[in-house]
Amino acid sequence: MTEAQLTGPPWPTRHVLDVDDLGPDGLASVLALAESVPADLPPVYAGQGVALLFEKPSNRTRNSSEMAVVALGGHPVYIQGHEVGLDVRETAADVARTLACYHSTLCARVIHHGSLQRMAAALDEAGVPVPVINLLSDRAHPCQALADALTLRQVFGADSLAGRTVAYVGDANNVWRSLAIVSALLGVGVRVASPPGYGPPPEDLELVASLGGAAAVTTEPGEAVAGAHAVYTDVWTSMGREEESEERRAAFEGFTVDAALLSEAAEDAVVLHCLPAHRGEEISAEVVDGPRSVVWQQAANRLHAMRGLLAWVRGLDAGPGGFR
C-alpha cells in the first residue's frame, strides 16, 4: 500500500502527543470508550496494522498497546528503536512517512518529544491521514494519565471527581505533566511536592491554568498531601537518567510516600503509582502493597485506556446515544 492508496477518513487526523490534544470532549469520549464492554466496540482496525515503535523498554505500555490493538481487530507490529535509528539512521519525518504506508496508526515511545512532533508534522504536511500517539516521551505520558483518570473515576465515581484533590510527591516529570493536564480537564485539583530544582517548569503551570486548572507547588510533602483524596508518586530516577541516581536519592530524602505521610491525606484517600515501583525509595512496601493502594487497578486500566484511545483516533466517539 502506498500513501496514494490510503483513503482519507471522514474526520480530522487525531494526533495525541499529550492529553490536552484531546480537549474536554475528546477526553470524555475516550474515557467512555475505555469503560465500554470490549465486545461492544466495533473492530475499527480490522485488517489494519498499528506500528508500535519503542526507543525505550516497556512492560505495561507495550503489553497494553498490543492487546488493545488486537481487541479492536488490528495487527500490532512491535518495532525496536535500533531497527529504525530515529533521527540518526533516518529522520523522524521519513520514518513516519514510511510506516504510514503500512499502518493506519503510529504509536511511539521516544527519547525526545520533538521526534513525535516531527512525525506528526510530516504526516500532516503530506496530507497523510494517519494519527500519531505518544506512548511516552521526555515531556509527556498521556496513555498513563488516561489510565489514572479512569482509575479515579472508578474509585470516586465519574460524577464525584470535581473538587477532589490529587497530591503528587516526587519529580515533576512527564508523568506529573500529563497527570496535571488530565486533572485540569476533569476539574480535579492537583498539588505537587518536589525538592528544589525538581519542581514543574512555569510553562507546565501556565498550560494547566489555561485549561481551567490550578496546581499548588510546594517543597513540603506533608503540605501537598494534607487532606488529598489521592496520593501519587513515581520513581525518583526516570529511564535515561540513571547516572543521576545517587544525586537524586540525596535530593529526594524525605519524599518517600510512607504510612506516616499517607496519614495526612483524607480518610478515603487512595495511592497511585505508574510503576515500576522502587520500594523503600519513592514509596514504602507497606503503602504500595497496602489496602489503600490501587496501583494494580491502575495498571489494568492501561489496557482499557489504550483501547479507548486507539478507537477514538480512528474516528469512534461515544456519547449518550452510543457509538458514532
Question: Which residues does each predicted region cover?
Answer:
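Phosphate/diphosphate ligand-binding glycine-rich loop within oxidoreductases
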Residues: 45-153, 279
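Rossmann-like adenosine-cofactor binding region
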Residues: 209-286
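Adenosine-phosphate binding glycine-rich loop
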Residues: 268-269, 274-324
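Positively charged, low-complexity intrinsically disordered leader regions
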Residues: 1-67
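A short, gly/pro- and small-residue-rich
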Residues: 115-137, 243-265, 291
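Glycine-rich phosphate/diphosphate-binding loop of Rossmann-like nucleotide-binding domains
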Residues: 55-67, 154-233
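Phosphate-coordination loops involved in phosphoryl transfer and adenosine-cofactor binding
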Residues: 44-50, 161-164, 268
